[in-house]
């Protein structure tokens, strides 16, 4: 079922890109959060329920959703499972055919993961984050003096920025 879902998502994204390109008369690049959302941004390191304080759920790549001490422990094997699942998804996307080109994207939340997948291109000698084609900053990760902005400034991938209602014009310009 998973392969069918991925194939369907790729076909929908490709169809939408074709419609948009035809209507606008310009090329359109289809980009999707195609390989899952395994990390969650959190404003607080912990959460409290009924007087019990535990680490926040940070996504399936980090810890479990169930509100128990065991589930909320960081588990490095989760990160490895996430990597394998994302790699399998990208293989399925590649197998859908060259005419259905969809690029993978995600928010660069887990900096250790992003750093581990950063490589220097042999020809250009420039670093690229190979965890996705397009990585982005979100509401909680786009602080100008933050580690996420510093990391994404250090790689040569195309980078997206999620700008919500709290963003100012000055912040947007500074991130450019």
Where in the sequence are the language-model features?
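Active-site-facing alpha/beta catalytic cores
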Residues: 2-176
């Amino acid at each position: 079922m998973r392969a069918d879902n991925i194939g369907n998502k790729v076909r929908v994204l490709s169809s939408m890109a074709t419609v948009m390109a035809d209507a606008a008369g310009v090329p359109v690049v289809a980009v999707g959060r195609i390989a899952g959302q395994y990390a969650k941004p959190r404003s607080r390191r912990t959460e409290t329920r009924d007087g019990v304080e535990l680490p926040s759920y940070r996504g399936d790549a980090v810890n479990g959703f169930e509100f128990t001490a065991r589930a909320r422990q960081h588990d490095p094997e989760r990160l490895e499972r996430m990597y394998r699942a994302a790699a399998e998804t990208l293989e399925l996307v590649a197998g859908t055919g060259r005419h259905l080109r969809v690029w993978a994207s995600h928010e660069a939340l887990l900096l250790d993961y992003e750093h581990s997948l950063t490589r220097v291109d042999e020809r250009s000698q420039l670093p690229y984050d190979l965890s996705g084609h397009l990585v982005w900053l979100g509401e909680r990760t786009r602080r100008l003096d933050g580690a996420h902005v510093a990391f994404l400034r250090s790689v040569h991938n195309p980078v997206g920025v999620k700008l919500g209602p709290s963003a100012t014009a000055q912040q947007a310009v500074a991130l450019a």
